Amino acid sequence: MNKLLFLSKKSSTSNLYRFYSRAPINESSIKSSFDPKVVEEFKYKYWQDSGLFKPKSNNGGEKFSMVLPPPNVTGSLHIGHSLTTTIQDSLIRYNRMMGKEVLWVPGLDHSGIATQVAVEKELQVKQGKTRFDLGREKFLEQVFQWTDQYSSNINNQLKITGSSLDWSRSVFTLDEQRNDAVQTAFIRMFEMGLIYRSTRLVNWCPYLQSVISDIEVDHKVIEKPTMLKLKSRKKSVEVGAIHNIAYMMEDPMLAPLIVSTTRPETIFGDTGLAIHPLDERYKDYHGKFAIHPFNHERIPIVLDDILVNREMGTGVVKITPAHDFNDYQCGQRHSLPIVNILNSNGTLNENSTAEFEGVDRLDARSMVIEKLEQMGLYREKLAHPQTLSICSRSGDLLEPVLKPQWYVKCKDMADKSIEFVESGEIKIIPESFRADWSRWLTNIQDWCISRQLWWGNPIPAYRVIMIDKVTNEDLDIHLTETERLKQEKWVVGKNEKEARENVFKTYGIANAGEYRLEKDQDVLDTWFSSGLFPISSMGWPTATKNSDNDNDFSRFLPLDVMETGSDILFFWVARMVMMCSTLNNGEVPFKTILLHPMIRDSQGRKMSKSLGNVIDPLHVINGISLQDLKENLSKSNLSQQEKVTATKGLEKEFPQGIPQCGTDSLRFSLAQYPINGKDINLDISKIIGNRLFCNKLWNASKFVFNYLVNLNNLSINLYYNNNNNEKDQQQPFNYLESTTLIDKWILLKLSKLVEIVNESYKSNNLSIAAQSLYSFFQYDFCDIYIECIKADLSKPILSKQNEHSSLVLASVLDSYLRMLHPFMPFITEDLWQRLPKSKQQLEIANSIEIDDSLSIMISDYPNPSYKYHQLFKNQEIEIEKQVNLFLDTLKLIRSQKVSLGINEKTKLIIKLQIIGDDQILIKSSFNQLKDSFEKLLNSNLIIDENNNNDNNNNNDNNDLTNISINKFTISKELQISIEFDKEINNQLNQKLINPNQSNDKKILKLENFIKQLQDEIDNPDFKQRVPEKVQNIKIEKLNQYKIELKEIYKK
């Protein structure tokens, strides 16, 4: 009796699992239904402990490498991360099974602003303190403790979702080696002239007191006057209104100019008014001056056809160069003074007035209006739609502020990155994003990389401050800020020693007593460290291709694929290409950019906690009740109104909660969505459907196992010689050549599947692979093949044909499980281990040294080039024709039974009358499938290739008559008649005489079927989420129902 291999808990050894052999399995020895918790438990730990995630040398063969886009350490993984890991892990597992040396590096991003904000909030809630109360050093200690906790949570989530990452190579963007890479990159880019310091307008968050990046800016559209509640402040502020203010003219003969502004509080920074040079209304104001209402200084009237639109408002624009991006450009064109009116915390500074100094700029808005009213200069308030820029991290309104910052010159690097894509050195999938790539990089601006935070990669720069040799005072102490910024000197260095060496190299100052160094207290933008991730995760700058050809840097760069969300193509992917190629001798960091779209809810809405439509992958995997969903919501930091809205959203979206679906179901569902579309509308019902698919896979496998029990060792060895050892082209295939028509058909279908799936992986179109795998198993394997062979396999005597069919069952299931494994790793591992193993494999499994060599994840992936998958190719057309004729016959007879209202249990006589040139072929096919045909249709089948109607001798059932009720043609070569017993015949004749008595119910039933199918097909998500083959089946069924209904109405 052959032996099977299983995974089992291992006691008293380091590995959680061991392989062992025992008697073959049958239906009674595994659980009756699929339980994802039981199936998925322990397997990941076994894989990891066995070292299966590490690259295995293949003696110079092909390699495949990826890095996981490092999740922010700030919290839990969301459904978008699950899509990323599903796609990436599927690619990794596929290439590992293809025999390549595979590396997938995990990592976490320190997420500067998000992490600092989260820890500050926790500090305030738990201790009532700010970071300033703790001081920089102690605050950073708390942040590191916090990140340790959350990084563990994230890594556990990645393991739960089956991500086969090499954890021994895990990195963190603030660990010692990555921090050194960041410092090195900054210094080298500074020395190359790519990093420089400049004073410009930036997006400033007063709450964080830092610059923020464009990706951290939320844009909120306000249509009318609204009192807006901001997370960063207790008081609401009015927005959506524009205020008209009068500016008195220096020339008393000129009428005041009326300006419109949504931000009256910025009036203290006004240094000019602008009019259009061709505006006839203001031709007398050319070259004139207005008087500032608060400081009473003269401010010029400038002519500017760029800033001013004559058709908008009054046609006069106030210019505040220090606090508006457009005004700044205008101020530069006309050499206007730049007056900053804000402190770092958003309060007004000394450039306002004594009355306003220290007042928050949003509180000052109403105070300024009141003061202008007292002066008689306030005219009116009007409704005015506006778009607000809000910090996504703090919820505060952003302010354009003039600040000295560090910048990266991007133009040359961007041009080179465009060239990489145009030359094909880097491929972008979907290709539609090539245009975005070119457009974004063509119009790129220099990148502000400094942040005024405590948490992040420190900037390795020092300001050189000259000192008075006599007084020992700083020489710039008496300079204005503008003068000081113009004269300041900067050097770079990882430490003060390096910085002093650079002082001498740059400025020729040898005497350390002539100056002092002041370390820059800012940190770098998180995207700077992330931009280095492909090379820093491989050991750069310590490891290079010149240093050691055996390191990861030499072996695995460039990465084969960089897979990530399309929303960060510019913010992250483009910067990786620019920075890594610049720092690595012009070499690209990866060959292919694979982008997936944003995941939305089933209604196409963006997922948001405030809408109650966010899907937590762990909730899908483990299941959660509606009550628990509501309880989690109640603990969130949403406002009370947002909680009310979100609760309604939860009740609508998940009225029964979310049932336990398991990891495999979630992964398979995500993989089935095409990634070349704009967005993915995720429907929980699809995941639940794939949970049922898992159960069907489980039950079908049990069916297969039940028929493998009585196979002998010779059969098993034949099976393994011909299937698992497919690379050996010399093995005999005699037993497969003698299999039945339906066996050959399923093997042909399997071969086609192998071709489609492999091609899908090569083209990075994984949804085609996933949909094809679903369709093959659901329809070809289960609905057709298994149903057809049940009649033969159920016979009490085990024939050679039955044995061959059993081997085909095992063979197809084995190949299918291996193809499905990258998408559904847990259930496939469990079921594959239950398949029979060859003697050689058992010997390997029993070897302590290499007892991990029989996991499905390191088995061979089915390859269309193997001889096993080339069988019957020369018979393909003939086999397809025969089986399709058989299936069409089944379908039509079933349809006729439904049309006539015949009970499934009613015994039929079915006569096949074969005519034409292919009588022998058709007769052979129906003879081979006769048992299946009779079992599936509860019938007796009589075959007459000579069109002879005298078939009574073939009828052994005395209760059946030869009165033909229904005759029809299947094809030009095949006609069929159906006969019933006398009682059924009388009933049918009665229905034909009084059709309305039976037709009313039939019409109603058909109309309901038609409506259900039509509604499903008309659903906008139908084409996106339903496999093409299933779509065709449903459309065909709909048309069939319509024809049946039409025929009834005719009668």
Curated annotation (Swiss-Prot):
Pfam family, one: Anticodon_1
Catalyzed reaction equations: tRNA(Val) + L-valine + ATP = L-valyl-tRNA(Val) + AMP + diphosphate
Transit peptide, start-end: 1-20
Enzyme category, top tier: ligase
SUPFAM superfamilies documented for this protein: Anticodon-binding domain of a subclass of class I aminoacyl-tRNA synthetases, Nucleotidylyl transferase, ValRS/IleRS/LeuRS editing domain
Motif ('KMSKS' region): 606-610
GO cellular component, one term: cytosol
Residues given in the record as ATP binding sites: 609
The organism's place on the tree of life at top rank: Eukaryota
GO terms assigned for molecular function: aminoacyl-tRNA deacylase activity; ATP binding; valine-tRNA ligase activity
EC numbers, comma separated: 6.1.1.9
Coiled-coil region list: 972-1019
Motif interval(s): 'HIGH' region: 71-81
Localisation: Mitochondrion
InterPro entries from the UniProt entry: aa-tRNA-synth_I_CS, aa-tRNA-synth_Ia, Anticodon_Ia_Val, M/V/L/I-tRNA-synth_anticd-bd, Rossmann-like_a/b/a_fold, tRNAsynth_Ia_anticodon-bd, Val/Leu/Ile-tRNA-synth_edit, Valyl-tRNA_ligase
This protein's UniProt keywords: Aminoacyl-tRNA synthetase, ATP-binding, Coiled coil, Ligase, Mitochondrion, Nucleotide-binding, Protein biosynthesis, Transit peptide
NCBIfam families, A to Z: PRK05729.1, valS
Family assignment from sequence similarity: Belongs to the class-I aminoacyl-tRNA synthetase family.
Name this polypeptide is given: Probable valine--tRNA ligase, mitochondrial
Taxonomic lineage: Eukaryota, Amoebozoa, Evosea, Eumycetozoa, Dictyostelia
Gene giving rise to this polypeptide: valS2
